[in-house]
Amino acid sequence: HYVLGNNTINEAIDRIKQHTFPRVNAIIFLLHKPQGLGKQANVLKPSDPRVQEFFELLTAESYYRFGVDSCTVPGMINFGKNYDINSLDTCEAGRFSAYISADMKMVPCSFDTTGKHEVDLRRHTIQEAYDSETFDVFRNKLKFSCPGCKNKADCLGGCSLMPEIVLCNRVTKNKVI
């Protein structure tokens, strides 16, 4: 795994250009998130020319097998050149997946640390949590975000928890109607 952020993207670009991921069978790129020990300063911006260069190189090279986490998918969609859209698995938070913490709180995404979208499984079933108004509100933010965007069906609305990590520079990004 390779965490891709402001502090690592130059190295990632250089390694792809120079084919210097020695004896590596496959690389999974995980987008840096400003959670836990993650710093806001390491969040990549879609306007950074290195972001476009990284995705163009990544999708042009055939020397490595690679994968990306679902948070990185908007970057692939917006900057990648040669990939199969069906190979991408975008964010499914609250739609097809959820996270259950050790204290039995269910949230749409493991990066939701605010408590705003949590449902207590000591008082509710998983089905009740999934069908709850709390989860509906979360899903609707994604469902109605980015109106008119031609890539909405592939990106599914980016990230409502941390919009700053969405590698998209379209004016429709995260706008909710």
Q: Model features per residue range: what roles?
A:
Residues 1-107, 111-121:
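Radical SAM enzyme [4Fe-4S]-AdoMet core and its adjacent flexible, acidic
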Residues 106, 110-177:
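Flexible mid-to-C-terminal extensions adjoining Fe-S/redox cofactors in radical SAM and related proteins
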